[in-house]
UniProtKB/Swiss-Prot annotation:
Changing H242L: Strongly decreased phosphodiesterase activity. Changing H651R: In allele ENPP1b. This is Ectonucleotide pyrophosphatase/phosphodiesterase family member 1. Nucleotide pyrophosphatase that generates diphosphate (PPi) and functions in bone mineralization and soft tissue calcification by regulating pyrophosphate levels. PPi inhibits bone mineralization and soft tissue calcification by binding to nascent hydroxyapatite crystals, thereby preventing further growth of these crystals. Preferentially hydrolyzes ATP, but can also hydrolyze other nucleoside 5' triphosphates such as GTP, CTP and UTP to their corresponding monophosphates with release of pyrophosphate, as well as diadenosine polyphosphates, and also 3',5'-cAMP to AMP. The modification Phosphothreonine is found at T238. A motif (Di-leucine motif) lies at residues 27-34. Residues 173-573 are annotated as: Phosphodiesterase.
Length: 906
C-alpha cells in the first residue's frame, strides 16, 4: 500500500525528514558555498567606492554571478517549473511540498495560500467516486477513492464513469433502449445473475412526478417492466416489508410485524437499535438467500433486513453487518467487485440497500427540495451501477429488480391523536405510536392475554364526530391487511385515516411535522416502486399493481430455485417475464359433491307469511327441472364456472333453482355459497318477505331453519344469500330465495348492511357495469388466520342458543364479477373484472359509528374498507373461483390478486 502523496510506478521516491521537509541535496550545498566567499569583498568594495578600487569590477562580476546562480538554484530546487511558467493549478501537484504562487499540500488551508482548484482537484477525489473532465489525466494518489489517471484501466482502479467522461464513450443512460432478447453474458457466467436493489422509502408517486429529473430510473422504467404501484404489506414499515419481499410472507407469518415489537412468549422486545435484532428467534419463514443455500446457489447481500442474522443457522455466502455510515458508492462498488470473483466464489443472487430517499423524506417531508435532491442522488447511483455493469459486460446479462419497501406521507402536528385525552390515567398501558398504533398493558407478560382489551376498544369507539381513528380487536381488522395471527401483534390495534397518527400523549409522538409511513397499504402515498430490467423481463411493459409478497416467487423463477411455502400466488407475475418459468394450475376439488333430490316432508316453520306470496304447489313445480333447464341455469348463474370446494372431507349438495345456484353444506347445515347474475335492467320487487320461509325438501330440516327459532332473540336472526326481491325470470316464478337452503344465521345489526347491499348497491353496480355476477356466503375464521377453519375448530366455536347448537359466521363474503368491456354482459365476457369483500359479522355496528346516520352515509364506506382480493376470499372460504374460464391460470391469478388503490386521501 503506497502512502498518500506518492505516485505509484513513476520515477524515484524522495525521502523526507521527520519534520516533513525535504532533505538538502549535497550538490546544492557545494554550489551555494561561493556565496560565502563573495559577501566580505562586496562590503569592502562598497566602503572603498570613493577610491575607485581597480578590483571593483571584479567584485561586481562575482556578485552578479552569485545572484544568477542563486536564481538558477531557486528555480531548480524551489520553484521548479514555475520559473518557466506561473503555476496556478494543483493538477499533478496534490499533497506535494512544492512552492509557487499557490500551494497544494494540506498546510495550504491553514496558511491560506491554496491554489484555487485545491478543493476540487485534491480534496473532493478523496470522497467523490466519479470522474469529471477536469480530473481526466490526473496523477494517481492512493488516498483517492477511485482514479481518473490515464493508466487507471491498467491498475483496475478507474472511477465508474471514466470511459464516458475521459474516453468519450457513451454512458449506459445515453445508449438507445433495446430489447434484450437473449442474455449477453461473459463466458464465465453460465446464467444471468439477479440483483435485488432497494431504495428505501421511494414513494411510487415520486417517479410519476419527478421522472423527468431521474434519467436513469426513467430509462429502466421505459426499457424494462414497470408497475405504477407496488403494494407493500401492512404496516408499511421498513423491516416488515423488506423481509416480506425476500420471504413472500405476510408480516404476521414471518414474525417481523414492525420495526419495534414485543413478544409475550419470549418476553423480549425488538428494535432496530438493539442487539435483540440479531436474535434468530424473531425471524420466521425462509428468506431467499436461505432458499438459495439449500439448493447450492450462492448469495451476496450488501445490507438487507435479516441478512446479517443466522436464520436456520445460515448466513449469505457474502454479507455485511449493517452500518449506515458506509457510503452508497462503496456499497455499489463492492457488489461490482463480487461480480468479478472466480466462478466458484461468485454469488448468483445479490442484494443492495440504500437508505434514501427515506431518510430525507423523514427529515423534510415527501414534498421538499431535499427529497428531490435525494432522488437525483439515488438516480446517479443507479446510473453508477449500470455503468459498472456495462464495463463488466453484464448490462445485458444481469436481471435487476429495482424496488422500494413503502412510500412516504406528510406528517402534521394537527393530525395526531392522543389517547390520554380519552382515557385520563394511562399509566397502565403502553402504545406503539404511529399510523398503525398498537396497545398493550405495561404489566407484561403477566397481563398481556388477560387485559380487558374489549372494554377499552368500546370505550375508545365513536367518541366524537368524524373520529380519525378506529380501535380494533385484531380479529375484526380488514382481512386484506393480514395483520392478526401473531402474538407479537397486540390484541388491540388502531386504524388511522390518511395522514393521521396516534400516540399515548404528546411527549411520545414522533414525525409530527415531517415525513412518516406505516399507514394502510392501499393508501396511494404508501405505494412502492417496482422496476424489472434485464434479459428475463419484458421490454417496455407496464403492468397492473401487485403485492410485494409476489416478488419472492418471481426471484426464485429467475434463479431457478424451488420456492419455500409462502403467501404469494406463484405464477401471478408470469406476465412480467418474456419466458415464464412456472406454469400454475387450478387446485383440485377436495369436497364430496352430490345432487340432492326431494326427500323430506314439509313441516311447520313457525312463519307468518301471507299465503299468496308462497303458493306451495307452484313452488314445488319450479324445482322439477329438466336437463335443458339445468344447462340454462348454469349458464345464467355461474357463467365462469361454479366455485370448487377445497374443504377436505366436506359433503356438499349442489342445489339448482331457476334464478340461482347453491352449494349447500350438509356438515354445517347452511349454504357455503350462492351464485346469481344481476343484469342491468333487472328490478327488485317491493313485496315484504319478512317472516317468510319455504322448506327446502331436498335438505334435512334443522331447528335453525325455522322462523320460530329466531323470534325471541333480540340480536340474532337469519339472512338470505340470494335476495328474495330479485325476480328476473318471470312474474309467474315465485321467489325461490325464500328456501331454507338459502338462509344463514345473521345478526340483526348486520342485516342493515346486507339489505342495503342487496336493495341499493347491487342495483347501482349492475347498472354501472352492464350487469354483474354475484357469489356470496358465510365465512368462519375463529382463529383469525385468514384461512378456512377445520371442522374441529368449527365444532369448538359453535354456540348453544335455545338448546340448539348453532354456528354463527365470523364474516360474510361477496365476489362481484363483470366484464372489462362495458358493451358486454356478464354472460359473454371476453375479459373479467372483479371486486371482493369480506365483511365482519358483528352484533353491533360500532365500527361505523352509525348512530343517527343513514345507511347511504356509511355502508359503502364500510365495504371499501373491507375490500379484499378474490384470493383472500378463496383462502378464508376454501373455495376456488373461475375454473371454467379459458384464460391461463396465471392470467386468472392476476385477476384474483388485484386490489385497487385508495386514490382519495383527503
Amino acid at each position: 500500500m503506497e502512502r498518500d502523496g506518492d505516485q505509484a510506478g513513476h520515477g524515484p521516491r524522495h525521502g523526507s525528514a521527520g519534520n516533513g521537509r525535504e532533505l538538502e541535496s549535497p550538490a546544492a550545498a557545494s554550489l551555494l558555498a561561493p556565496m560565502d566567499l563573495g559577501e566580505e569583498p562586496l562590503e569592502k568594495a562598497e566602503r572603498a567606492r570613493p577610491a575607485k578600487d581597480p578590483n571593483t569590477y571584479k567584485v561586481l562580476s562575482l556578485v552578479l554571478s552569485v545572484c544568477v546562480l542563486t536564481t538558477i538554484l531557486g528555480c531548480i530546487f524551489g520553484l521548479k517549473p514555475s520559473c518557466a511558467k506561473e503555476v496556478k493549478s494543483c493538477k499533478g501537484r496534490c499533497f506535494e511540498r512544492t512552492f509557487s504562487n499557490c500551494r497544494c499540500d494540506a498546510a495550504c488551508v491553514s496558511l491560506g495560500n491554496c491554489c484555487l482548484d485545491f478543493q476540487e482537484t485534491c480534496v473532493e477525489p478523496t470522497h467523490i467516486w466519479t470522474c469529471n473532465k477536469f480530473r481526466c489525466g490526473e496523477k494517481r494518489l492512493s488516498r483517492f477513492v477511485c482514479s481518473c489517471a490515464d493508466d487507471c484501466k491498467t491498475h483496475n482502479d478507474c472511477c465508474i464513469n471514466y470511459s464516458s467522461v475521459c474516453q468519450d464513450k457513451k454512458s449506459w443512460v445515453e445508449e438507445t433502449c433495446e430489447s434484450i432478447d437473449t442474455p449477453e453474458c461473459p463466458a464465465e457466467f453460465e446464467s444471468p445473475p439477479t440483483l435485488l436493489f432497494s431504495l428505501d422509502g421511494f414513494r411510487a408517486e415520486y417517479l410519476h412526478t419527478w421522472g423527468g429529473l431521474l434519467p436513469v430510473i426513467s430509462k429502466l422504467k421505459n426499457c424494462g417492466t414497470y408497475t405504477k404501484n407496488m403494494r407493500p404489506m401492512y404496516p408499511t414499515k421498513t423491516f416488515p416489508n423488506h423481509y416480506s419481499i425476500v420471504t413472500g410472507l405476510y408480516p404476521e407469518s414471518h414474525g417481523i410485524i414492525d420495526n419495534k415489537m414485543y413478544d409475550p412468549k419470549m418476553n423480549a422486545s425488538f428494535s432496530l437499535k438493539s442487539k435483540e435484532k440479531f436474535n434468530p428467534l424473531w425471524y420466521k419463514g425462509q428468506p431467499i438467500w436461505v432458499t438459495a443455500n439449500h439448493q447450492e446457489v450462492k448469495s451476496g447481500t450488501y445490507f438487507w433486513p435479516g441478512s446479517d442474522v443466522e436464520i436456520d443457522g445460515i448466513l449469505p455466502d457474502i454479507y455485511k453487518v449493517y452500518n449506515g455510515s458506509v457510503p452508497f458508492e462503496e456499497r455499489i462498488l463492492a457488489v461490482l467487485e463480487w461480480l468479478q470473483l472466480p466462478s466458484h466464489e461468485r454469488p448468483h443472487f445479490y442484494t443492495l440497500y440504500l437508505e434514501e430517499p427515506d431518510s430525507s423524506g423523514h427529515s423534510h417531508g415527501p414534498v421538499s427540495s431535499e427529497v428531490i435532491k435525494a432522488l437525483q442522488k439515488v438516480d446517479r447511483l443507479v446510473g453508477m451501477l449500470m455503468d459498472g455493469l456495462k464495463d463488466l459486460g453484464l448490462d445485458k446479462c444481469l436481471n435487476l429488480i429495482l424496488i422500494s419497501d413503502h412510500g412516504m406521507e406528510q406528517g402534521s402536528c394537527k393530525k395526531y391523536v392522543y389517547l390520554n385525552k380519552y382515557l385520563g390515567d394511562v399509566n397502565n398501558v403502553k402504545v406503539v405510536y404511529g399510523p398503525a398504533a398498537r396497545l398493550r398493558p405495561t404489566d407484561v407478560p403477566e397481563t398481556y392475554y388477560s387485559f380487558n382489551y374489549e372494554a377499552l376498544a368500546k370505550n375508545l369507539s365513536c367518541r366524537e364526530p368524524n373520529q380519525h381513528f378506529r380501535p380494533y380487536l385484531k380479529p375484526f381488522l380488514p382481512k386484506r391487511l393480514h395483520f392478526a395471527k401473531s402474538d407479537r401483534i397486540e390484541p388491540l390495534t388502531f386504524y388511522l385515516d390518511p395522514q393521521w397518527q396516534l400516540a399515548l400523549n404528546p411527549s411520545e409522538r414522533k414525525y409530527c411535522g415531517s415525513g412518516f409511513h406505516g399507514s394502510d397499504n392501499l393508501f396511494s402515498n404508501m405505494q412502492a416502486l417496482f422496476i424489472g430490467y434485464g434479459p428475463a423481463f419484458k421490454h417496455g411493459a407496464e403492468v397492473d399493481s401487485f403485492e410485494n409478497i409476489e416478488v419472492y416467487n418471481l426471484m426464485c423463477d429467475l434463479l431457478g430455485l424451488i420456492p419455500a411455502p409462502n403467501n404469494g400466488s406463484h405464477g401471478s407475475l408470469n406476465h412480467l417475464l418474456k419466458k415464464p418459468i412456472y406454469n400454475p394450475s387450478h387446485p383440485k376439488e377436495e369436497g364430496f359433491l352430490s345432487q340432492c333430490p326431494i326427500k323430506s316432508t314439509s313441516n311447520d316453520l313457525g312463519c307468518t307469511c301471507d299465503p299468496w306470496i308462497v303458493p306451495i304447489k307452484d313452488f314445488e313445480k319450479q324445482l322439477n327441472l329438466t336437463t335443458e333447464d339445468v344447462d340454462d341455469i348454469y349458464h345464467m348463474t355461474v357463467p365462469y364456472g361454479r366455485p370448487r370446494i377445497l374443504l377436505k372431507q366436506h359433503h356438499v349438495c349442489l342445489l339448482q333453482q331457476q334464478q340461482f345456484l347453491t352449494g349447500y353444506s350438509l356438515d354445517l347445515l347452511m349454504p357455503l355459497w350462492a351464485s346469481y347474475t344481476f343484469l342491468r335492467n333487472d328490478q327488485f320487487s317491493r313485496d315484504d318477505f319478512s317472516n317468510c320461509l319455504y322448506q327446502d325438501l331436498r335438505i334435512p330440516l334443522s331447528p335453525v331453519h325455522k322462523c320460530s327459532y329466531y323470534k325471541s332473540n333480540s340480536k340474532l336472526s337469519y339472512g338470505f344469500l340470494t335476495p328474495p326481491r330479485l325476480n328476473r325470470v318471470s312474474n309467474h316464478i315465485y321467489s325461490e330465495a325464500l328456501l331454507t337452503s338459502n338462509i344463514v344465521p345473521m345478526y340483526q345489526s348486520f342485516q342493515v348492511i346486507w339489505h342495503y347491499l342487496h336493495d341499493t348497491l347491487l342495483q347501482r353496480y349492475a347498472h354501472e357495469r352492464n350487469g354483474i355476477n354475484v357469489v356470496s356466503g358465510p365465512v368462519f375464521d375463529f382463529d383469525y388466520d385468514g384461512r378456512y377453519d377445520s371442522l374441529e375448530i368449527l365444532k369448538q366455536n359453535s354456540r348453544v342458543i335455545r338448546s340448539q347448537e348453532i354456528l354463527i359466521p365470523t364474516h360474510f363474503f361477496i365476489v362481484l364479477t363483470s366484464c372489462k368491456q362495458l358493451s358486454e354482459t356478464p354472460l359473454e365476457c371476453s375479459a373479467l373484472e372483479s371486486s371482493a369483500y369480506i365483511l365482519p359479522h358483528r352484533p353491533d355496528n360500532i365500527e361505523s359509528c352509525t348512530h343517527g346516520k343513514r345507511e347511504s352515509s356509511w355502508v359503502e364506506e364500510l365495504l371499501t374498507l373491507h375490500r379484499a382480493r378474490v384470493t383472500d376470499v378463496e383462502l378464508i372460504t376454501g373455495l376456488s373461483f373461475y375454473q371454467d374460464r379459458q384464460e391461463s391460470v396465471s392470467e386468472l391469478l392476476r385477476l384474483k390478486t388485484h386490489l385497487p388503490i385508495f386514490s382519495q386521501e383527503d
